[in-house]
């Protein structure tokens, strides 16, 4: 039996302060913000963080530009968009959040234990860079629902996942939570820039 794990620790600057959200959950108050997290390379990830219940009172006192630490878990929910299509929203649900002085290097660590439920084909990018995508099913610690988390491996790690890990395998991941922009092409030829969120593997075990 899998001992599921789903933990995220982030620190960074609030690029957009917390705002009340409504529409998909009428039971508990929810508030969302955008957290900007710097990589060692200097590139910045902008990720959605969400507070619920009494934590919204703490979160909504924070201002844009504040440096904060967040501890939580990755969650997702499905909804019907204005286009009438089904969409999935991936975000970090906050268990703890606190304001602090800016660190020299932002924190970004994910710990996941779950099962592989989907495995994409190994892709090769320019300069022979390899990318392997998988979907990992894990649990939300404070909910009974599953979370199906997009995960990517790059370079030699991608080859390792491709050759040694298959659907239904239990996998233990240490990684980084990141945002990635891409262009979606529709049947009518129209292209739209969108953002997806995923875990990039830095270490894995079975």
Tell me what each language-model feature is.
Residues 1-206:
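Single-stranded nucleic acid-binding surfaces, predominantly the OB-fold ssDNA-binding core
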């Amino acid at each position: 039996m899998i001992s599921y794990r789903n933990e995220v620790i982030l620190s960074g600057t609030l690029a957009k302060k917390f705002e009340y959200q409504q529409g998909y959950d009428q039971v508990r108050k929810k508030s969302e913000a955008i957290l900007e997290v710097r990589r060692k390379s200097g590139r910045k990830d902008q990720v959605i963080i969400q507070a619920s219940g009494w934590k919204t009172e703490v979160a909504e006192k924070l201002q844009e530009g504040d440096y904060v630490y967040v501890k939580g878990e990755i969650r997702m929910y499905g909804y019907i968009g204005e286009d009438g299509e089904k969409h999935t929203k991936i975000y970090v649900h906050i268990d703890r959040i606190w304001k602090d002085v800016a660190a020299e290097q932002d924190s970004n660590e994910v710990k996941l234990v779950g099962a592989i439920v989907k495995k994409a084909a190994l892709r090769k990018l320019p300069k022979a860079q390899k990318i392997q995508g998988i979907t990992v099913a894990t649990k939300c610690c404070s909910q009974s629902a599953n979370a199906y988390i997009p995960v990517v491996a790059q370079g030699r790690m991608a080859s390792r996942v491709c050759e040694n890990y298959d659907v239904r395998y239990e996998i233990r991941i240490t990684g980084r939570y990141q945002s990635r922009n891409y262009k979606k092409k529709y049947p009518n030829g129209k292209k739209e820039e969108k953002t997806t969120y995923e875990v990039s593997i830095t270490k894995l075990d079975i």
